[in-house]
Amino acid sequence: MGTEKVLVAMSGGVDSSVAAKLLTDAGYDCVGCMMKLYDNEDAGIPKGHTCCSLDDAEDARSVARRLGFPFYVFNLKDKFAACVIDRFVDAYEHGVTPNPCIDCNRYLKFDKLFERADILGCRYIATGHYARVERAGEKYVLKKALDETKDQSYVLYDLTQEKLARVKFPLGSFHKTDAREIAAEAGLCNARKHDSQDICFVPDGDYAKIIAARTGKEPQPGPFLDLSGNVVGTHRGIIHYTVGQRRGLRMPSDGKIYVVRILPEQNAVVVGPDSALYTNECFVANMHWISGEAPAFPYRCSAKTRYRQPERPCTVYPAGQTGVRLVFDEPLRAITPGQSAVLYDGDTVLGGGIIAREAAEC
């Protein structure tokens, strides 16, 4: 087993570099690669907000050289633009709030990596994600990382049995402090490098600028509506808003007002008090079950509706052809269409899907 070939996805950061180090130490025949997804330098994105800049590529190449394996850069900018940036833009134009990191994992970090792995004769691929894969009988299960503060299982819910059989997450049983210590002891150039932050193709969090540049259109103003449907102001375009938002509404109010819903068909934004943000159910479209099979309904488990949010107990019911309805034991605040709902049984990831506005979207 020690001579098996692994394609290691390297970002130039400490996590993927340590993943490569651990695999090399275990005797695997590693091949390093970086996916060039976006011209960070041309967009003026500062260091520390990137994952595939020229400096990142140099760091990854330096690590590969030190560990003694070849390194390649794959140009996937067109694929990234089509499958991540354009989907991101389309979501905001339709009044939902996407998670582009999940699309990047789905369409780039796994689909394209497996294609390249096959070309290079690699049996496995590996990444620096903090998550674990275990075998349970005839099935593979995806589990949270031991370091729950760094756990990334939420963005991996779309993995299939076929992919889990060929993926390795060497950092799943380590803490972040362990990774930095391993990198420092190995003399890796990025042992103290800061983690990348925010969405890699959005400088300074200015989503509207990216959307306008991509579409060539200016956002269209429309009405702010109260919970009764009365016009109470004018918004700057629905791309500027997400459920739960308070800042930037620029409207007079006697109290704290938040975005409650976005109605793209009417180009309207519904606003109301904080209490209007709470609900105990949501619909989830295109539900993916990692085991390949849906459980018997109703099903008890827990779910999280945002990345950095603890999961909450709920009951799962079928909805539509491929969706589910989640009914939480207690109301949750600002469940947001376009985000992912990911289901857990303890530390095991059951699967997930995209939060829909209504049952008809399932």
Residue ranges and their predicted role:
Residues 1-157, 168, 177-178, 184:
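ATP-dependent adenylation/nucleotidyltransferase module used to activate substrates
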Residues 126-134, 138-362:
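AMP-forming adenylation/ATP pyrophosphatase catalytic core
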